[in-house]
């Protein structure tokens, strides 16, 4: 019962995080966007956070459905996420193309509904979520110029506009 509750909480993060955080102009979101755009170490930490969520999902799902072979199929995706360089490259490539984002979203929905492929769908959902919150090239190029802002509102507006472009 506890594993089922943990599994539901972990899976619900895919739905609740974008709802409360994506495109918001709060101070926490602006700080998150600025740190992700400026620091390679923060992007690596973000990749490791994604890996931890995927592994936690696998552990709870395997405890619930022991005879299911779905976690074995999605383990390949989890193994790909172990290397920070590959994770960053994967997230950057997914973020760069709207058609790839749409394809992975549709694939995640289809595999979630397919028998035995639920874990693959949730893993793809986590990868899609991480790619959406990954900084765009626009903000990375803008931050390299070290712009000077006169007030916080200007920083907030530019950050949110360029980060999610």
Whereabouts are the PLM-identified features?
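Cytoplasmic membrane-interface regions of multi-pass membrane proteins
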Residues: 22-37, 80-99, 141-147
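Hydrophobic core of alpha-helical transmembrane segments in multi-pass integral membrane proteins
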Residues: 14-18, 50-56, 76-79, 128-130
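Alpha-helical membrane-associated segments of multi-pass integral membrane proteins
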Residues: 95-148
């Amino acid at each position: 019962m506890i594993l089922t509750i943990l599994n539901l909480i972990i899976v619900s993060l895919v739905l609740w995080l974008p709802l409360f955080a994506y495109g918001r102009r709060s101070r926490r979101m602006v700080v998150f966007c600025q740190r992700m755009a400026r620091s390679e170490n923060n992007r690596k930490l973000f990749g490791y956070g994604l890996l931890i969520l995927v592994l936690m999902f696998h552990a709870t799902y395997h405890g619930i459905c022991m005879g299911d072979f779905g976690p074995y199929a999605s383990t390949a995706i989890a193994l790909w996420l172990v290397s920070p360089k590959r994770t960053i490259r994967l997230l950057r490539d997914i973020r760069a193309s709207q058609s790839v984002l749409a394809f992975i979203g549709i694939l995640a929905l289809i595999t979630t509904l397919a028998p035995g492929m639920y874990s693959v769908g949730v893993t793809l959902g986590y990868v899609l979520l991480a790619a959406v919150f990954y900084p765009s090239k626009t903000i990375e190029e803008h931050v390299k110029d070290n712009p000077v802002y006169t007030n916080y509102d200007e920083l907030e507006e530019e950050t949110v506009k360029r980060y999610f472009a």
